Every structure is written in structure tokens, then in C-alpha cells.
Amino acid sequence: MHVAFATQPAPGSTVNEDAIAATDRVVVLLDGASIPHGLEIGCRHSTAWYVAQLGTELLEQLTDQRDQLLTDALASAIHAVASLHADTCQLDHPGGPSAAVALLREADQTVDYLVLADTTILLDEPAGIQVISDDRLAQVAVTEHSAMHREATGSLTHQRRYAELVTELRRHRNQAEGYWVASSNPDAAYHALTGSIRRLDVRRAALLTDGATRLVDRFQIMAWPHLLDLLDREGPYALIKQTREAESTDPEGRRWPRSKRHDDASAILCRFRCCPVPSDG
């Protein structure tokens, strides 16, 4: 499996809360949840710290134990990271650092995947593009989402509405009728979307944070097949560049209401060995 990726913090930010880790068999993509200023989190560590630790643990789990179920690997990684700060932080706090997760593994006969929270995986199969996306987060706190989207992105009122949204989301985090995300509870791993497809049926795959899917799901400028072709033709940085250009045409979110003017954006393209890999030249 040939892997190409790009990741970029939101313009104006020096901290990237996304994380990528990869080998020629395993790809890990994490999207850390942003925390509005002023909200308590019960933890001395940042979201960036959390995704860095979780990414490292996941890659170790998946490379050391190649036959391990992806859910088991994620559960073990969540437990391992929790143990790193169990003595210093309030692990049961609903606002503690958390992350959405996307995993892809090339096995001998299959390609295995896992999606937890708002990340997306695209699989290029003979029947077309399969889209695996966990939308449970969007199904809760609907009233708070709507209230935030009525305000100009970045305004003081928008910031207050965003904090209210996050406060409400915390009530539903890792709950049966809410949504699931990687944080301190290993059980969240077993609520991920998972699957396997025949190795020979996959030509390309993409793993995307929600900051890299905006051209399709938020802005509706292109469709998933076009996004995958853009990644393949011009590379992951080109996707992020086009996303930034679109964001800049609507800084206040009047055309495309959203929680943040810009978001951290990460995109990974995987090409499989059954298919010729274009030269870089």
C-alpha cells in the first residue's frame, strides 16, 4: 500500500489537533475535538497531547499484533493513554480531551476499516465509491447547532453559541443514545463503524478529517468521486488548498454556516499494489 498524506492546522493557529501515523500496512487518522475557551476539561493535558499519544499507541498496537481486531486495538490504545494521566487528571470528566478516529489496515486477503465519530473513509470499489462516515454527532444537540449556525462565524455571539453547543454535546458523549468518541473509556471502541472488504476489490482509499471533507459535505462544491480523483491526481495538499480557498470566500459563514471559519484539515490517500502507482515525476 502506497500512502500519501497532508495535514495542516487552521489558518491563524500554530497548533494542529489532527494526527496521522502510517506504515505500508496501517494508517491511523485522528481528529482531536476542539475545546472552546473557558470550558472546564478536568485534565491538565491538551487535545494535541491526547491525539499524539493515542496515535502512537494505535500504531504500536496495529504493527505489533497484525491480526488484532481494529476495535480491540483502539480499546487497548484508549486504555493505555488513560493510564498515562489517571493519577493527575479527572478521567470521567465529560469534557476531557477526545478524538475522532479513522483506521485502515491492509491484511493479506482483506482491507479492514474503522470509523469513530466525525471522520470519513472512502473506498474505491468495482461498484463505485463506498463512503463510511459516522454522523451520530450531528444527530444530537440539534437545537444548539441551529442556534450557532444563525450567527456570523467568529462573532462573539457565535462563540457563545459554540460553547453552548459543546456543553450540550458533552451530555451525550459516549452515551447509548448519543455519540461515541475516543477519550478515556475503552468501551467507545466497540461502538465504531467497522468492516472488511476483499483486498483485490479495493483500488484506492482515502481517510479524511471533517476539515478535509467540507468541499463535499458542507460546501457541496464537488462529489466524493471528484474529491478522491483530486487526491489521486494532485495530492492531499491540493485538496486542503482548495478547501482554504472556498472557506475564504465565506468568512462569516453566511453561505455555509459552520462551527469554525477554518478547521484543521488532514487527508490521506492509499493506493494498493494491485494497481500501478503513478511516478512522482
Spell out what each predicted region is.
Residues 1-281:
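PP2C/PPM-type serine/threonine phosphatase catalytic domain
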